[in-house]
Structures are given as structure tokens and as C-alpha cells.
Curated annotation (Swiss-Prot):
Protein name: Immunoglobulin superfamily member 11
Membrane topology of the entry: Single-pass type I membrane protein
Bias-annotated ranges (Polar residues): 376-389
Cell compartment(s), UniProt: Cell membrane
Annotated GO CC locations: cell-cell junction; plasma membrane; synapse
Signal peptide positions on this chain: 1-22
Maturation and modification: N-glycosylated.
Occurrences of domain Ig-like C2-type (ranges): 144-234
Molecular functions per Gene Ontology: ionotropic glutamate receptor binding
SUPFAM superfamilies for the chain: Immunoglobulin
Length: 428
């Protein structure tokens, strides 16, 4: 009976010893924070009843930047240490002499990329069972980098401006505090600040808003600042602008007027260049002293050319006065009826008294008339380069006929005194 009772007791003792000798990794503090560039210690310890002859320790990391690619940090196996990922070479090691139940490691010169979740895996054969994994988080803190201060918006009086402040680096994310560097260190009453975004909005800026502003970026391990000088611009006098605008407007108007005048002048000049048909009338000239001629040649025809078709006698009669037809004609054939009057008169003959308009004319020597007729056709129409039409007169021929005064009296001609003209056509 005693043996039966002792058997269950012995089995209970063996089971208790087995539980006591199982491997167990102690709990970690959870998270470790360290500033960038400093040394971080990641704790890990375990308990075991077996000898440490077959101890196997592996440290792994799950980077915060890439959780899908775990990396090996350091390995202890068979009494030797092996390096893990290349970026940890020369920076990682065990804090104690191995083998040992304290398998904590250190990481020198921590970098921002070292942030992540680290796992400690421990195996010590033949010891089995229990929890053999320890988890520790590492956060590498980065102080705020030097922030950049900027002004957004117009600095004119009465405008709204925004002061910006931001740091490229900072873990944890820094907060921003704006202040004006004056006696009160307070922002203007119209300013609204956002410490998370790092902005300050100042509405309706005035001369009191001018000054030096400071932005302080801070987090758990450091601070950094930047300065910004805000100068409100007062409006410039508008008189200068008004004068400049008036001068510019006047200059433009003058240029436009000159252009219009020039255009009108050239248009008028081009119009006046068009040649018009010249009206050349038939003329009757009375000579003071006609040459003496025989009775056979008292009335003769003389063909001559007139240089400028101008009058050369002192008394001039229009040819249509002697024409039976009162309507003027350019054709000089109307004077052919005088060809039948071929009578000769002596140069010394006495002319009887002639009365005109009730006046008694003084007797004098015989006078003759020279009838000058211009024969010409209509002018020729020629096109010009600018689209207008010019008229070019045909060459004209001048014929002169001599008529005695007696003949003129017989047909009832009445002399009329007309002012003499020069060759250029002006009155003398």
C-alpha cells in the first residue's frame, strides 16, 4: 500500500521539476527611445535549467519603413557570433559575455532607419517549452531641423499675410510657436496661429504689424528656430502716377492726330494730281499795225504755232462773237465763211467815223484782226498706277487768219477793249 501511494508522489515531483526547468524569456519594457546618433540598448533575458552548451540566440528587426522585409541583426550559435544585415555591421553586439542568460544587445550610432520592432528568439536544447520570444520596440528620435520661415501674400498696407514655418526633419513631429520679438512677445491682435501647421495669419496688416518674428520648432528631444522680418509697405503718392498717365495719354493722342493729318494731306495731294481736261478757247487777236499788203493778199491765211496758247495782242475778241451761231464750238471751222471776204484796202485809207454806244470814235489808220484758232481733238484717257484715270491731250495745231477792220465793220462787228495779258496769262 505504501509503494502505491509513493508512486503518484514521485510522478508529481518529476512533473514539477520539468515545469521549473522549461525555458522562459522575460518580458521586455516594450519600447526604447533614443536620439539619433546615440547608443540604444535592447534588453532580452531568459531562464533555463539546462546547460548553455547548445544556446542559440537570434535577433531580428521589422523596419518601420518596410514591414514586409524582416532583417537579421545578430546571431549567436554554437559558441560564435555572426553579423546580420550589412547596415548593422560594426554597430551591434551583445552587452554581456556569451553564452549567458542575458542576451541583450546594443546599437551604436543609431540612425532614423533603425526605428522598428526587434525580436529576440532563444533556444537552449534540450530545454523546451515556454515562451522563447521577446519583443522590443526601438524609436530613434530626431530633433527638428532648422525651420524655414516665409511670407505669403502682399505686404502692402491693409493686406492679409501668412507666416509659414516648417522643418524637413523631426521625430516626433515638431510643433511650431510664433512670437514677435518686441517688449510683449505677443502677436498682433488680428493674428491667428496654428501650431501644428506652423502658420500665422495676420489680417489687415498695419504699421504696428511690422517687426521681427521668430518661429520655434520643438519636439521631445530638441528645438530649432528661424527669424522673419515683416515690413509693411505704405502706399506711394498717387500724384506721380496720375501725371505719368496724363503725359502718356497726351502723347498717344498727339501721335494719333499727326497720323490723321498726314493721311488727309496725302489723300488730298493724290487727288489733286489727277489731270483734268484743259479748256483751250478760240481767240481773235487785233493787231495795232498790220503789215502792208497788196490787194491780192489783203486777206490771207497764216499758219503758226503758239508756244503756250497765250494772248499776244492788246485787244482780244472771243471767236464766238463773230460766229452766227451763238452756241460756242471748239471746232474752228466756223470761221471758214470769212474766207470769201478777200478785199484789199490801202494802208493809208481813211476810215469813216464809227459810232459805238453813242460815242464818236477818232479816225485812224486801218487796223486788221488776226483770228487764232486751235484745232485739237479730245484728250486721250490713260490709266494710272494707283487706279485713277488721267487725260493726256492730243497735240494741238494753231491756225491764224487775218481780217481787216473794214471787213469787220461791214459785217457789223463792234470793237471791245479788253485788258492786255502777258504770255503767262496774267493781266498787265
Amino acid at each position: 500500500m505504501t509503494r502505491r501511494r509513493s508512486a503518484p508522489a514521485s510522478w508529481l515531483l518529476v512533473s514539477l521539476l520539468g515545469v521549473a526547468t522549461s525555458l522562459e524569456v522575460s518580458e521586455s519594457p516594450g519600447s526604447v527611445q533614443v536620439a539619433r546618433g546615440q547608443t540604444a540598448v535592447l534588453p532580452c533575458a531568459f531562464s533555463t535549467s539546462a546547460a548553455l552548451l547548445n544556446l542559440n540566440v537570434i535577433w531580428m528587426v521589422i523596419p518601420l519603413s518596410n514591414a514586409n522585409q524582416p532583417e537579421q541583426v545578430i546571431l549567436y550559435q554554437g559558441g560564435q557570433m555572426f553579423d546580420g544585415a550589412l547596415r548593422f555591421h560594426g554597430r551591434v553586439g551583445f552587452t554581456g559575455t556569451m553564452p549567458a542568460t542575458n542576451v541583450s544587445i546594443f546599437i551604436n550610432n543609431t540612425q532614423l532607419s533603425d526605428t522598428g520592432t526587434y525580436q529576440c528568439l532563444v533556444n537552449n536544447l534540450p530545454d523546451r517549452g515556454g515562451r522563447n520570444i521577446g519583443v522590443t520596440g526601438l524609436t530613434v528620435l530626431v530633433p527638428p531641423s532648422a525651420p524655414q520661415c516665409q511670407i505669403q501674400g502682399s505686404q502692402d498696407l491693409g493686406s492679409d499675410v501668412i507666416l509659414l514655418c516648417s522643418s524637413e526633419e523631426g521625430i516626433p513631429r515638431p510643433t511650431y510657436l510664433w512670437e514677435k520679438l518686441d517688449n510683449t512677445l505677443k502677436l498682433p491682435p488680428t493674428a491667428t496661429q496654428d501650431q501644428v501647421q506652423g502658420t500665422v495669419t495676420i489680417r489687415n496688416i498695419s504699421a504696428l504689424s511690422s517687426g521681427l518674428y521668430q518661429c520655434v520648432a520643438s519636439n521631445a528631444i530638441g528645438t530649432s528656430t528661424c527669424l522673419l522680418d515683416l515690413q509693411v509697405i505704405s502706399p506711394q503718392p498717387r500724384s506721380v502716377g496720375v501725371i505719368a498717365g496724363a503725359v502718356g495719354t497726351g502723347a498717344v493722342l498727339i501721335v494719333i492726330c499727326l497720323a490723321l493729318i498726314s493721311g488727309a494731306f496725302f489723300y488730298w495731294r493724290s487727288k489733286n494730281k489727277e489731270e483734268e481736261e484743259e479748256e483751250i478757247p478760240n481767240e481773235i487777236r487785233e493787231d495795232d499795225l498790220p503789215p502792208k499788203c497788196s490787194s491780192a493778199k489783203a486777206f490771207h491765211t497764216e499758219i503758226s504755232s503758239s508756244e503756250n496758247n497765250t494772248l499776244t495782242s492788246s485787244n482780244t475778241y472771243n471767236s464766238r462773237y463773230w460766229n452766227n451761231n451763238p452756241k460756242p464750238h471748239r471746232n474752228t471751222e466756223s470761221f471758214n465763211h470769212f474766207s470769201d471776204l478777200r478785199q484789199s484796202f490801202s494802208g493809208n485809207a481813211v476810215i469813216p467815223s464809227i459810232y459805238a454806244n453813242g460815242n464818236h470814235l477818232v479816225l485812224g489808220p486801218h487796223k486788221t484782226l488776226v483770228v487764232t484758232a486751235n484745232r485739237g481733238s479730245s484728250p486721250q484717257v490713260l490709266p494710272r498706277n494707283n487706279g485713277s484715270v488721267s487725260r493726256k491731250p492730243w497735240p494741238q495745231h494753231t491756225h491764224s487768219y487775218t481780217v481787216s477792220q473794214m471787213t469787220l465793220e461791214r459785217i457789223g462787228a463792234v470793237p471791245v477793249m479788253v485788258p492786255a495779258q502777258s504770255r503767262a496769262g496774267s493781266l498787265v
